[in-house]
Amino acid sequence: MAESVDHKELSESNQEELGSQVMAEGPGESQDRSEGVSIEPGDGGQHGEETVAAGVGEEGKGEEAAAGSGEDAGKCGGTDEDSDSDRPKGLIGYLLDTDFVESLPVKVKCRVLALKKLQTRAAHLESKFLREFHDIERKFAEMYQPLLEKRRQIINAVYEPTEEECEYKSDCEDYFEEEMDEEEETNGNEDGMVHEYVDEDDGYEDCYYDYDDEEEEEEEDDSAGATGGEEVNEEDPKGIPDFWLTVLKNVEALTPMIKKYDEPILKLLTDIKVKLSDPGEPLSFTLEFHFKPNEYFKNELLTKTYVLKSKLACYDPHPYRGTAIEYATGCDIDWNEGKNVTLRTIKKKQRHRVWGTVRTVTEDFPKDSFFNFFSPHGISLNGGDENDDFLLGHNLRTYIIPRSVLFFSGDALESQQEGVVREVNDEIYDKIIYDDWMAAIEEVKACCKNLEALVEDIDR
């Protein structure tokens, strides 16, 4: 018993020495040494199991040591396999994620940072361009103001245009003032050069609005009414009725927003203006809707302001989008009692459970309306439908308000329809070409089959 105990203590000391040697040596040597360990026949079954367990533990330690040595080698960058992985991940099929730049070689990474610095400088120049362009827009807005003011006066019957101002040559495109002067035609002649002057009115008789014919027709109507003994009361509307309502309803994006209960209010619009921010203020533009005094709300002016992104963020200067709208704010509408078209009021009768008394409770629910466009809550890029709202504000400022008469007359709609028809025709044309090509290919295939059949017959 004493010998077996001494032998067991000796084997345990040998295992500890062997484990310390494995930690000091490489994985290959530890594996060879572990394979060289033998079990003596006189040790007994218990000693054999302990030796096998020690061998398994030594192999695990060897694997951990090998992994540790591999990490150290990777940090030092001394293997040939690591040199092959220096290529960008984007070039070997990996997704371009945030760690892509970190995976690039040091020199390439420095060049990318240099490009980012150049991009930041370009964004600063773009921001400066936007501010100067806004100043130019402000300058020309003052030049447009007399024209827009006369438009307002004509719409609201403040000013009646003269006969000369109503002469409009509708068939002329790109008509310049130089073409309104007299043009000189030179025709060859045997006796010499004969100069014939062409009047500027030639070819435009059908384009003019003939006031003389209208006066004659009115005189005939008056005489007919006098002879018949009946008075003819013709409507003589002032200005252009429902001008802005018609303009807004002819805008595709605004059509679903305008409800029937909105139309009586929109008929009271006298003008819609675009006001640019003053010098020194943040870049923005404001849409101003001017109304007549009415029974619906106390406001005579409803506004919506769009603030433009004109400065770079210090923490992230790169996602600069140029003339992008950063956020928008509306205004509060002071509705008269019972006239709020953006809310639906429901009255409910409630009975008390104990006392049996009845009371009437009113509850308001939001309702679709054009006037939700003036919601006072600011809309930023984190909103849900901000892109549609920003696009609508941009179109109102750039296209709809400056060219309102074209939307009223339908000319803008015709141009949009022509664009759609052109696109459809292009698609139809492409389909015809494709069908012709496919038919030609099928004919060639049929000819080839016939030739193959003829060749087979000849061979037979």
Swiss-Prot record:
Pfam families cross-referenced by the UniProt entry: NAP (PF00956)
Cystine crosslinks: none
Keyword field: Nucleus
Ranges of compositional bias, category Acidic residues: 213-223
Disordered: region residues: 1-87, 213-238
Tissues where the protein occurs: Brain, specifically expressed in neurons.
GO molecular function, one term: chromatin binding
Family under the similarity heading: Belongs to the nucleosome assembly protein (NAP) family.
Reported function: Acidic protein which may be involved in interactions with other proteins or DNA.
Matches recorded under PANTHER family: TESTIS-SPECIFIC Y-ENCODED PROTEIN
Designated name of the protein: Nucleosome assembly protein 1-like 2
Organism: Mus musculus
